[in-house]
Regions:
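Acidic, glycine/proline-rich low-complexity segments that act as flexible tails and inter-domain linkers
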Residues: 1-48, 61, 68, 72-76
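Generic structural signal for hydrophobic core residues of well-folded globular domains
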Residues: 34, 56-62, 91-92
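A cross-kingdom feature marking solvent-exposed beta-strand/loop segments within repeated
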Residues: 68-90
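Short, structured motif recognition centered on aromatic/hydrophobic residues
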Residues: 49-58, 87-88
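Compositionally biased, intrinsically disordered low-complexity segments
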Residues: 43, 90-91
């Protein structure tokens, strides 16, 4: 995995190791390089704004489980609990 992707993944999900590393290491390497390096370096959004957008979209599409999973990652990138509450209230 590319170092940038590895560092970004670790900041988002500290200590998390995907089961795909064992079952399909080629797939997870390609996916991680795409998701955690190419995508995040493709636009002009700062990380905090990106995570605010991700949280709002997940609520908007009723992706509640995914939303819960991304809360800690968003916090790791600077989204505050007050901002998280605001996102939730705006999506109601």
């Amino acid at each position: 995995m590319i170092d940038n992707a590895k560092n970004y993944h670790e900041k988002m999900f500290p200590g998390y190791v995907s089961d795909f590393l064992r079952t399909d290491p080629e797939f997870i390497e390609a996916f991680d390089n795409f998701a955690f390096d190419e995508v995040v370096n493709q636009d002009d959004l700062d990380d905090k704004t990106r995570f605010i957008s991700i949280l709002a979209v997940l609520l908007g599409c009723q992706g509640i489980d995914e939303f819960k999973g991304m809360l800690k990652a968003a916090y790791n990138f600077g989204v505050t609990p007050v901002e998280m509450k605001e996102i939730i209230s705006l999506c109601l």
